[in-house]
């Protein structure tokens, strides 16, 4: 075959465009170009180091396998960027008989490699769920069986559930870990009925050492699925096998759930997960940034964490949008450059200054008059600085305007107060928790208007 790099890359782009969403394709794949094609090695050039790292992590295998299928031979792909960074995408394993790529080694469960205990950020709202999940991973089938993880969308239920699977596979590689959504369980059951292979279906699920079932609330109203799951549950539980369920609500609140299933789901531990507080949201963003080799300032992390409060998925999505736009535009990563990018997608409006003052006064035990006054007593001064900091975070007011609201303080006083509290958030746990609690109360009040 004549080596025509541009022809090859155009064919690859055509195939990838059909497989990926339009935003994904246009953001990550389309800006990348082929630089060199020699024998069994392809060199691709990404526009910058950030895009290079992202492609290598999330799309390297897909690109490599696509090229291998086009060339009908094994191929190595290297990624490079103008900054001189170079990474190996992956090496393909091509089977000429089937025309499909295959991978050597033992088949593993459908577990996301990112969902491990080491990458889970523990905070006050998920501490019990994390401890229970870890206990189950260390000693399955003993203390908490079943373990039911309850919470809203994007709060970490799936992460903890899959972390249990990873932990057991690390300590016991031959363990049978089944991770399945309720929808997949139902679909497998339907196929088994159609093919008259119910016994095979039952034997498959009832040989699990750990059964992880996501979105169990979707079992509502599915009578035959509930019937089969009831007997699967009983078989595993009686054999001392671990069952972990994830739901957006407690079992007794799932409509149409058979009483006998509700009773069994509730016989173990129901661990509730609530939306993360400000401190935890900041820690999540920091951990995410470290994992992606991103250098984010505290002000940027704090800005995103303050504006995205609903769940972790929303938080990480905001970070990805921000970093992607900054990487492509070439602008520095500052709060000023992020605001136009993030604000249009955030259901956010400035909180009322009097509401912030009222909540801050109640939480700190300092009157509004003292917050606005000139007293230098330590507890009053600290409360005033916290209130100024929160006013800065939750409103669009300028520093001079904030100073006016606090009895005519100079804007440099406001700036000093905001900087001081910002520094204390990483050094003083008591201050950090107090600021987080007040911030969450402000957000809650604003959302309920």
Swiss-Prot record:
Residues 110-326 are annotated as: Domain III, AAA+ region. Residues 73-109 are annotated as: Domain II. Its main location: cytoplasm. Residues 1-73 are annotated as: Domain I, interacts with DnaA modulators. Residues 327-449 are annotated as: Domain IV, binds dsDNA. ATP binds at residues 154, 156-158. PANTHER family: CHROMOSOMAL REPLICATION INITIATOR PROTEIN DNAA. Plays an essential role in the initiation and regulation of chromosomal replication. ATP-DnaA binds to the origin of replication (oriC) to initiate formation of the DNA replication initiation complex once per cell cycle. Binds the DnaA box (a 9 base pair repeat at the origin) and separates the double-stranded (ds)DNA. Forms a right-handed helical filament on oriC DNA; dsDNA binds to the exterior of the filament while single-stranded (ss)DNA is stabiized in the filament's interior. This is Chromosomal replication initiator protein DnaA. It comes from Picosynechococcus sp. (strain ATCC 27264 / PCC 7002 / PR-6) (Agmenellum quadruplicatum).
């Amino acid at each position: 075959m004549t080596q025509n790099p541009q022809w090859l890359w155009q064919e690859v782009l055509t195939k990838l465009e059909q497989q990926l969403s339009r935003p994904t394709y246009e953001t990550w794949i389309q800006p990348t170009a082929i630089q060199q094609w020699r024998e069994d090695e392809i060199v691709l050039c990404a526009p910058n180091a950030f895009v290079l790292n992202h492609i290598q992590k999330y799309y390297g295998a897909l690109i490599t396998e696509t090229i291998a299928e086009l060339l009908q031979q094994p191929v190595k792909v290297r990624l490079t960027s103008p900054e001189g960074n170079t990474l190996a995408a992956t090496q393909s394993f091509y089977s000429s008989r089937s025309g499909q790529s295959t991978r050597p080694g033992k088949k593993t469960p459908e577990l996301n490699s990112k969902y491990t205990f080491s990458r889970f950020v523990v905070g006050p709202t998920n501490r019990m769920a994390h401890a229970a999940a870890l206990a189950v991973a260390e000693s399955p089938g003993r203390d908490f069986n079943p373990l039911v993880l309850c919470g809203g969308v994007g709060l970490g239920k799936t992460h903890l559930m899959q972390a249990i699977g990873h932990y057991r596979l690390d300590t016991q590689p031959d363990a049978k870990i089944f991770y399945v959504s309720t929808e997949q369980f139902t679909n497998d059951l339907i196929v088994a009925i159609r093919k008259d292979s119910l016994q095979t279906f039952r034997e498959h699920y009832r040989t699990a050492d750990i059964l992880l079932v996501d979105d169990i609330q979707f079992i509502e109203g599915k009578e035959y699925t509930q019937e089969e799951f009831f007997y699967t549950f009983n078989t595993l539980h009686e054999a001392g096998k671990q069952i972990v369920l994830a739901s957006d609500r407690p079992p007794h609140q799932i409509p149409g759930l058979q009483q006998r299933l509700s009773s069994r789901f509730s016989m173990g531990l129901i661990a509730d997960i609530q939306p993360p507080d400000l401190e935890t949201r900041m820690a999540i963003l920091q951990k995410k940034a470290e994992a992606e080799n991103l250098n984010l300032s505290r002000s940027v992390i704090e800005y995103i964490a303050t504006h995205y409060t609903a769940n972790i998925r929303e938080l990480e999505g905001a970070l990805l949008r921000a970093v992607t736009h900054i990487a492509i535009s070439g602008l520095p990563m500052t709060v000023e450059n992020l605001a136009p990018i993030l604000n249009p997608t955030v259901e956010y409006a400035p909180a009322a200054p009097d509401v912030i003052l009222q909540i801050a006064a109640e939480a700190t035990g300092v009157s509004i008059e003292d917050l606005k006054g000139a007293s230098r007593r330590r507890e009053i001064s600290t409360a005033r600085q916290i209130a100024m900091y929160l006013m800065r975070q939750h409103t669009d007011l300028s520093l001079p305007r904030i100073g006016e609201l606090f009895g005519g303080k100079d804007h440099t006083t406001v700036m000093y107060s905001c900087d001081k509290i910002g520094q204390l958030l990483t050094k003083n746990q008591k201050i950090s928790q107090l600021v987080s609690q007040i911030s969450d109360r402000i957000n809650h009040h604003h959302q309920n208007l």
